């Protein structure tokens, strides 16, 4: 608090030194991640997202009246994907292409599920779980420390 004795402030900081250092390390890692150039081109990323989308689309074709959404790729700092149902459009983060394929499959299916439910309600998560029961494990693959990389254009078959 303003006007607190310096000894009290020092004791407060000393008592939380481990947490402060851990937070500092996390903040530095985020900064390094944002400044590191992406190892995947936009074209290769779009090809990957299109390939996974082609496998997911049949699950949602009826909701979309058989019309595939427009897929886009852009540099995003805080999201892996964004779905705009009114525009029938999904935008993916370029950095998502650096993650393991199972994580990419999760994000693609997650964004498609927004065509059914445009929120993150229990009903939305039920849609995700219906088609991908292991979605929580896949979502953990999006952590900053997990790197995957691109696989061959054919890649393994979808795991859902």
Language-model features: locations:
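Active-site-proximal or metal-binding-adjacent scaffold patches in catalytic folds
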Residues: 1-106, 115-160
């Amino acid at each position: 608090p303003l006007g607190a004795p310096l000894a009290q402030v020092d004791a407060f900081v000393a008592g939380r030194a481990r947490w402060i250092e851990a937070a500092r390390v996390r903040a530095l890692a985020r900064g390094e991640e944002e400044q590191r150039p992406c190892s995947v081109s936009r074209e290769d990323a779009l090809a990957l997202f299109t390939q996974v989308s082609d496998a997911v689309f049949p699950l949602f074709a009826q909701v979309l009246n058989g019309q595939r959404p427009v897929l886009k790729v852009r540099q995003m700092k805080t999201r892996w994907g964004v779905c705009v149902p009114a525009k029938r459009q999904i935008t993916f983060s370029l950095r998502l292409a650096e993650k393991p394929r199972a994580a990419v499959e999760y994000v693609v299916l997650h964004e498609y599920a927004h065509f059914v439910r445009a929120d993150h309600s229990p009903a939305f998560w039920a849609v995700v779980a219906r088609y991908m029961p292991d979605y929580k494990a896949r979502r953990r693959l999006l952590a900053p420390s997990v790197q995957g990389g691109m696989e061959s254009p054919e890649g393994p078959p979808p795991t859902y």
